[in-house]
Amino acid sequence: MRYINLLILTLVITVSAIGQQSLKAGAAAPDFNGESLDGKVFNLNQLQGKIVVLTFWSTRCEICHNEIPKLNEVVKRYRDKDVVFLALTMENQVKVEPYLRKNPFSFSILPNSFGVFLKYADMDKGGNINMGFPSYFLINQHGAITLKSDGWDKTSRLDSQIQQMLASE
């Protein structure tokens, strides 16, 4: 019975993944719901009219650890603007909270975001899910992805893109 359940689960994941395309700049950002550590509920569609920055990260990611202070500085620059920063992790609250005590974020953390991760991750022809950490998605006021980037030292590019988007309003 356990084997059959595993087989069914594998088929469901594979079939749902076959239709998934890699998200590119210009594509509509997939909607999602998520709850932050402080209990605030976020829905991407309800953030229409605002610039949204999604950061996918992990407590085990050394690059993430080094990038968060830089990203916190970017967040401070746009605190009074219509820019929403969300940090999404697949890890649960129990895992994330001790990390945050030593490495604070100045924006909302959404734990348990595996479902959102699946919507935003790339999939190769073999059906493997791929996303580097940290990954950044910049979403414009109309819900379209304007920047998709991952890895080391991307915050200056992110900052520049946000400035351009705000200037064109």
Question: What do the PLM-derived regions correspond to, one by one?
Answer:
Residues 43-62:
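Short active-site neighborhood of thiol/selenol oxidoreductases, capturing the structured segment around
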Residues 18-44:
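N-terminal "domain-start" segment that seeds a small globular fold
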Residues 5-15:
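Bacterial N-terminal signal peptides
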Residues 65-105, 116-124:
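Structural microenvironment flanking redox-active thiols in thiol-disulfide oxidoreductases
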Residues 29, 165-169:
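Non-globular targeting/processing and membrane-anchoring segments
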Residues 53-54, 85, 136:
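Hydrophobic beta-strand anchors of alpha/beta hydrolase catalytic cores
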Residues 102-105, 112-163:
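Thiol/disulfide oxidoreductase modules built on the thioredoxin-like
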